[in-house]
């Protein structure tokens, strides 16, 4: 299995280094649910600004303030503790009376707004995230500048970030131990983290191998393609390759790679043979996913950061802004720009 740091680059390995997250204010994330609160219902959506707190900690504190069980507070995604983040929490509080959430106090947190909502906010139920990053101590401004220009056109590999695999790869190691021993895992969180790490690692491997072998945006017979921004896919046939290639070049269609699991992967013929060969050595992880009935799925191989802009504060400091759809990783953008240094080279998002 290829280590995250050794995954193939789309724009070649960066020539310089830089510091990511010298302080929390250098990594700002604003959650975009893609919808507004209903204004009525038994749930309350609460938009929180936080710094130095992880999502679960804040959710538990909110539950305590509202005198409800912790399971009655949900969120769409985890946000990094060592960053400045805006996100929505959802608390089930039936009744007509609206609690005064302006009185909720927690160090490092501030309630920005809240309103009634009809439905529970479920994990993954967000449109995306807006990022504002500051890279400091950049050793090669010209290289970073050119890479930013190239990313606007060609995007970056849509790798799952190193944080998906746990500190020191602990989640992936847990999945491997589980696969090798077949010992039942009762802890639901561990099961989820380990299976997610296994499938993500296999996806990364397929994308890395495709980047090595050929133009990642070159459609081959049997590729599974999806409309940009959509989850469903269809299979490319030889007769359609020229037209499909035009639509891929126009960013109307995205070539996908497998998220391996049980059932058919989605590709056929040449593309399927390539994907199977790319992860042929990882028989234990593949068997684990099938055994645990994790359904195979697809994910776009490339990621195009939207609304990408940047501003050099000086020759060694650059502020970068962009928006990513849910499930994508800002660190997968940063790794195409600089070789990161510091304690926060790999961080949660």
Swiss-Prot record:
Keywords: Isomerase, tRNA processing. GO terms for cellular component: cytosol. Substrate binds at residues 27, 129, 329. It catalyses: uridine(13) in tRNA = pseudouridine(13) in tRNA. Its EC number is 5.4.99.27. GO terms for biological process: tRNA pseudouridine synthesis. The active site is at 80 (nucleophile). NCBIfam families: PRK00984.1-4, tRNA_TruD_broad. Belongs to the pseudouridine synthase TruD family. Responsible for synthesis of pseudouridine from uracil-13 in transfer RNAs. This is tRNA pseudouridine synthase D. It comes from Shigella flexneri serotype 5b (strain 8401). The lineage of its organism: Bacteria, Pseudomonadati, Pseudomonadota, Gammaproteobacteria, Enterobacterales.
